[in-house]
Amino acid sequence: MERKAETKAPVPVIERHKSGYIKIRVAESLQDITLALKMYREGFTRNAAQRAFMAWKAMISALTVMNLDKLPRNEEERKWYHRVGYKAPKAGLRWLADRLEDIGYQDYKLTHITSTALALHRYA
């Protein structure tokens, strides 16, 4: 009699490379904000605004991945976080900031900074 192998749900890619992804996104954020400041000083305000937005998006992505176990409230949200949420898509940026504040980041004014970042993105 042949035994069927137990099939486990595959581990999402982001879970396998969590710490590396966080380090890369934080480094990207720091590089982008440094570049944004340089561009701003040189008079390239629209380019600087876009770089500042990208820096914030990378930071929200890093915070999201750091808290992947705490953020989802149900199975549907968990799937979304593992599929696209960890990338901090522009359309979900405000929602991610709200969720991060809900789980303990309220002192950092993430929604306020996110609103400013989105305004910079519109300007760019």
Model-derived features with residue positions:
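Solenoid-repeat scaffolds in large eukaryotic assemblies
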Residues: 48-49, 55
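Long, charged low-complexity segments
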Residues: 68-124
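Charged alpha-helical initiation segments
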Residues: 1-45
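Alpha-helical solenoid scaffolds that mediate protein-protein interactions
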Residues: 36, 55, 62-63, 69
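Amphipathic alpha-helix face/heptad-repeat signature
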Residues: 25, 51-52
